[in-house]
Amino acid sequence: MITETPHPSPAERQALQSRVVQALSAVVPAHALLWHAEDTTPYECDGLTAYRQRPLVVCLPETYDEVQAVLRTCHQLQVPVVARGAGTGLSGGAMPHAMGVTLSLAKFNRILEVNPESRTAVVQCGVRNLAISEAAAPYNLYYAPDPSSQIACTIGGNVAENSGGVHCLKYGLTVHNVLKVKGFTVEGEPVEFGSEALDTPG
């Protein structure tokens, strides 16, 4: 479902933008913030290009501490945050908020571990879907959920959208292939879901 975002006056938008940029500048480097129109235009929509909205600010953190600090700061300012992976989705899931911050997680792109014995991988949320299969290929393994955008889409976006693909007819959707997720609430509190082991049958 696409939710219509408010249309603030230019003065309201500029005033809030200045407050948000000033506050976020205290928790992330200057190069991690984008707010000029020419810089934020690529973030106006995801793959559903019929709907566009320029975000107030785009933030590109590089560490988990920065993500947490950004979320806490925005929560204190009562500014909405929309997380964004590669922006390939067709559901409007990464649609920006006119008076909000787009939190780009593209820099979290490391594959931390591939374990052929347990047939598991530990990856950051910005890792491309296809990159996981490429890393597992030397062990004759692959990551089953394979959306048509797998060459570009990220695992974080796949988790958020419960992405599928042709292989899902046999191996299930993303939810059936992810054991554990670590992240933050919108208030910036750390959370974990699942575990590193499969559930015991029964």
Regions found by a protein language model. Name each.
Residues R84:
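Conserved PLP cofactor-binding pocket of PLP-dependent enzymes
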